[in-house]
Amino acid sequence: MENNKEVLKKMVFFVLMKFLGLTILPKGICSTRPKPSQLQRSNLVKTFKIYIFFMRVTLVTHENVKSVDQLLSHDLIYNVSGPNYDKLKTELKNQEMATLFKDKNVDIYGVEYYHLCYLCENAERSACLYGGVTNHEGNHLEIPKKIVVKVSIDGIQSLSFDIEQIKNGNCSRISYTVRKYLTDNKQLYTNGPSKYETGYIKFIPKNKESFWFDFFPEPEFTQSKYLMIYKDNETLDSNTSQIEVYLTTK
């Protein structure tokens, strides 16, 4: 009886947190270019927490797998293993999207989190992510494609670098790759104050609206809330899309 009560408490807490997360979304994905007031300032965030998170995180990579279960109507659970998990749950923006990938052969690429990750009572080694799902069949490129990432600092294009894609990319994976490059080479995230005041990555598809992700989270940074920007499961056509990064210094 006590065990059942404890499980019920966990479920109520989990659903409440998801409700709050879905009604108070982090600033991030939007069309066109953000207004300055829409961007988070790095001095309001403990950037060393972001640095530690991105340095420790392992990029989830699983290919040709099928879902085995669901907790809620908009998520999918997979029996796949990583260094710290034996089950993986991805949350999508709605039930309709989850249905598109349910019981299908898919590839999963994304950034996992563990805090507030709940699958079921017995899932002690579990991980969660938002989005990160693409169809396995018919989505690979015959020839690997390089996407050029153009980086502007204080309004001046300062550098560019390539990301090689073997399939049409999931934007959560691309976003992680860009952040990692900028952290390693331009000190985007450090274990102290960031030298950048604001920053965002902009995706420019050929036949639909542009969208962007803020590099800095809101002051009340938590992994699960911040990574929710990826729940729309946006993908990018590697042959026709562009990527731009905009940074401002203090």
Curated annotation (Swiss-Prot):
A Gene Ontology cellular-component term: extracellular region
Entry keywords, A to Z: Disulfide bond, Signal, Toxin, Virulence
Disulphide linkage map: C117-C128
Listed Pfam families: Stap_Strp_tox_C, Stap_Strp_toxin
Alphabetical list of PROSITE patterns matching this protein: STAPH_STREP_TOXIN_1, STAPH_STREP_TOXIN_2
Gene Ontology MF term list: toxin activity
UniProt xrefs under Gene3D superfamilies: 2.40.50.110, 3.10.20.120
Signal peptide start and end residues: 1-30
Matching InterPro entries: Enterotoxin (IPR008992), Staph/Strept_toxin_CS (IPR006126), Staph_tox_OB (IPR006173), SuperAg_toxin_C (IPR016091), Superantigen_bac (IPR013307), Toxin_b-grasp_Staph/Strep (IPR006123)
Keyword Disulfide bond found: yes
Keyword flag tRNA processing: no
Role of this protein: Causative agent of the symptoms associated with scarlet fever, have been associated with streptococcal toxic shock-like disease and may play a role in the early events of rheumatic fever.
Note: Binds to major histocompatibility complex class II beta chain. This toxin is coded by bacteriophage T12.
Family: Belongs to the staphylococcal/streptococcal toxin family.
Name of this chain's protein: Exotoxin type A
